[in-house]
From Swiss-Prot:
One of its GO terms (biological process) is signal transduction. It comes from Dictyostelium discoideum. It catalyses: L-seryl-[protein] + ATP = O-phospho-L-seryl-[protein] + ADP + H(+); L-threonyl-[protein] + ATP = O-phospho-L-threonyl-[protein] + ADP + H(+). This is Probable serine/threonine-protein kinase pXi. Pfam families: Pkinase (PF00069). The gene is pXi. Keywords: ATP-binding, Coiled coil, Kinase, Nucleotide-binding, Serine/threonine-protein kinase, Transferase. Its EC number is 2.7.11.1. Residues 642-691 form a coiled coil. Transmembrane segments: none annotated. It is an enzyme of class 2 (transferase).
Length: 691
């Protein structure tokens, strides 16, 4: 990056003009120190950004906007210093804290107080819109008080996600904080200035009742529940209804909002709303507990959060504590990148494998899997991932039962060994490397889990290959030993065993029946089972085909499933009754959320099998991790996302694929190993009883 990327920046050392004080804020991409002008003694906040970390275009855009803006209710950029390695912003220092933090300290709070606040914020947005600037991330965290006095004024900050929007084409970047995000942003239909009015509506709602208007139970259905809204004026409800209209063309404009009687103060209530203060304190505490960082953006790496800028906000150590909490949670569950886990998440571990995708474009790794409206994640759930179930018959002490059990166990063992060979080369797993398969997809797994894209899933490929080879070799040795023991039992058994030809014919018949059943059932997207009269080996095929033509594989479902509102906004594309995908609100961006893929739902497509010479071969190209990654990559390419975002997504997809394949393969081999041990134990038991 060149030396002078900011026009008009000061090249001389900042130490000549400012006394740099202690660090008052810290983030991944910037540090904030207190500063004192040596000439005037005026205190400022000095934000230091490394050129090697923060993207050049983002710095230039934010500085250009802040330089153009001059409003008493917007934090002012005073000076810009630049060195070979750093850009230093001298900002107006505010010490009064966030909007909600200030309000919850009050003992007396009325509708009129809320009306005054909303009126001020609306005028600030009117000023920005007059300059064709859309803030895109209007929320309480970005509304700060200038100081701690009673005369303190509100200041709007953080223009890292702001965009210019004239009368031309609409904006399409996926930016903002989900709790305050307008539906047209999450639906990717294009948006403009009305998104800021929607955010004002959400803030107004919270200011009057203490909690957000939408969650996973309501979607975008606006409600005024009792008793919280019983003492709130109809005029306030009228304003909120106008601001929270799902149709941006029918939503209140800036002028309509400012002219509304409630904003003018003529119809708002004067009585204290103590209940709202109590609820708001709870909401504010919960918001803080979840880290406060719920923003998603097209280029969040190039910006810092409000918590990094001013001393009145979260202490510096909280960033490290949050990171430690995230790391601890990640270690507790390989499939979660979560701040908190469900209390019953470890139950039915062998029946359900839930994988969470945080497709936050800023790739933030703070995700929450609670159902308490505190987070936004995407869950792709595949039930019954255990592909093979083997049930063995119990042996009895009678001689006849022992003999029957031995014969059954022999047949079952041989069948299981055959199936192990079949599965290693068909739809269940492929133990060969991508190179051996001609690059045709590498390792494939039935019902592959889509793990989170929000954390680093990096895993060295050479270590993965080494582990695979060791496990494969170990299984081969165990198989060989089991076969030898089986032959030994045949020779030592005093009971006449089935003739070789009879056994071969019996197994061949079972194998042919298996093929026919598989062909019939798989074509119907169902499960296949083989009943040999002694035990049942059941296989369930649950293909995941993220087709670009499938509703469940659409960009809105894969990328925006975290939105708790998409289910109502796009109900033409998503069938909630069939549980193809269920969206709720969560906090990686704000509140609650889950994506549920029902078994055999319309979101999955099943391919037909090819039958040749009495055997079938699965079309593995439509299954497995590689296919899912390719489908996701295809969907991402349609969005015209920034290059740096696409590069990051590609990297994470690649790392995810390696990690997921390694984990799934190990699980498969462990199951096979346990199965062989059980059969071996059964054979030994039968042998001892026989003696």
């Amino acid at each position: 990056m060149g030396k002078n990327i900011i026009a008009g920046s000061i090249s001389s050392s900042i130490h000549k003009s400012y006394e740099i004080g202690s660090q008052i804020g810290n983030g991944k991409f910037a540090q904030v120190h207190s500063g004192t002008n040596k000439s005037t003694g005026k205190k400022s906040a000095i934000k230091i950004m490394k050129k090697s970390i923060v993207e050049e275009s983002a710095i230039i855009k934010e500085i250009e906007m802040m330089t153009e803006i001059n409003h008493q209710n917007i934090i002012k950029l005073q000076e810009v210093y630049e060195t070979d390695n750093e850009v230093l912003l001298v900002l107006e220092l505010v010490t009064g804290g966030e909007l909600f933090d200030k309000i919850v300290e009050r003992e007396f709070y009325t509708e009129q107080d809320a009306s005054t606040l909303i009126g001020t914020v609306t005028k600030v947005i009117q000023y920005l819109h007059s300059k064709d600037i859309v803030h895109c991330d209007l929320k309480p965290e970005n509304l700060l008080y200038s100081d701690n006095s009673d005369q303190a004024i509100i200041k709007l900050c953080d223009f890292g996600l702001s965009q210019r929007c004239g009368s031309g084409s609409p904006l399409r970047s996926l930016v903002g904080t989900l709790t305050y995000m307008a539906p047209e942003i999450s639906s990717c239909t294009g948006y403009g200035k009305p998104v800021d009015l929607w955010s004002i509506g959400v803030i107004s709602y919270i200011l009057l009742c203490g909690f957000p208007p939408f969650d996973e139970t309501t979607g975008y259905v606006l409600e005024f529940p009792s008793p919280e809204w019983d003492n709130i004026s109809d005029s306030a409800k009228s304003l909120i209804k106008g601001l929270l209209n799902n149709d941006p063309s029918k939503r209140f404009t800036i002028d309509q909002t400012l002219k509304h009687p409630w904003i003018a103060g003529t119809t708002c209530g004067k009585n204290s709303i103590v209940g709202t203060l109590k609820t708001l304190r709870e909401f504010n505490t919960l918001r803080r507990t979840n880290g406060g960082n719920t923003t998603m953006g097209h280029n969040k790496q190039s910006r810092s959060t409000v918590f990094e800028l001013f001393p009145s906000l979260t202490p510096i150590k909280s960033n490290d504590e949050n990171n430690n909490n995230n790391n601890n949670n990640n270690n507790n569950n390989n499939n979660n990148e979560i701040l908190d886990k469900k209390s019953n998440e470890n139950e039915n571990e062998n029946e359900n494998d839930k994988i969470k995708i945080n497709l936050e474009l800023n790739l933030n790794n703070n995700v929450n899997n609670n159902n308490n409206n505190n987070n936004n994640t995407v869950i792709l759930e595949n039930n019954n991932n255990n592909l093979e179930k083997i049930s063995t018959t119990k042996t009895t002490t009678t001689t006849s039962t022992i003999n029957d059990s031995i014969n059954k166990t022999k047949i079952q063992l041989m069948n299981s060994l055959d199936f192990e060979n079949d599965s290693s080369s068909s739809e269940t797993y492929s133990s060969s490397s991508p190179i051996e398969n001609g690059g045709g997809g590498g390792d494939k797994f039935t019902s592959p889990e889509l793990s989170s894209l929000s954390i680093d899933l990096g895993c060295a490929s050479d270590q993965l290959n080494s582990d695979k080879e060791k496990i494969i070799e170990q299984l081969k040795n165990e198989k060989s030993l089991l076969q030898k023991e089986l032959l030994e039992i045949k020779r030592q058994s005093p009971v006449p065993s089935p003739s070789s030809s009879f056994l071969n014919n019996h197994l061949q018949q079972q194998h042919n029946n298996n093929i026919n059943n598989n062909n019939n059932n798989i074509n119907n997207g169902g499960s296949t089972s083989i009943n040999n009269g002694n035990g049942t080996i059941e296989r369930q095929f649950r293909p995941i085909h993220m087709s670009k033509d499938s509703d469940s594989g659409s960009y809105e479902n894969l990328l925006l499933g975290t939105s708790p509102f998409v289910k109502n906004h796009n109900n033409n594309n998503i069938n909630n009754n069939n549980n193809n995908f269920c969206h709720s609100r969560n906090s990686s961006f704000g509140y609650g959320n889950s994506y549920n893929s029902s078994n055999g739902g319309s979101g999955c497509s099943s391919s037909s099998d090819e039958s040749t010479g009495g055997s079938f071969k699965k079309d593995k190209s439509k299954y497995g991790v590689d296919r899912i990654c390719l489908d996701l990559q295809s969907e991402f390419e349609k969005l015209s996302l920034p290059k740096e975002t696409m590069d990051k997504l590609a990297s994470v997809l690649s790392n995810y694929k390696q990690k997921n394949q390694e984990k799934s393969l190990k699980v498969k081999y462990e199951k096979q190993k346990d199965k062989y041990k059980k059969l071996k134990s059964q054979l030994k038991k039968d042998k001892s009883l026989l003696k």
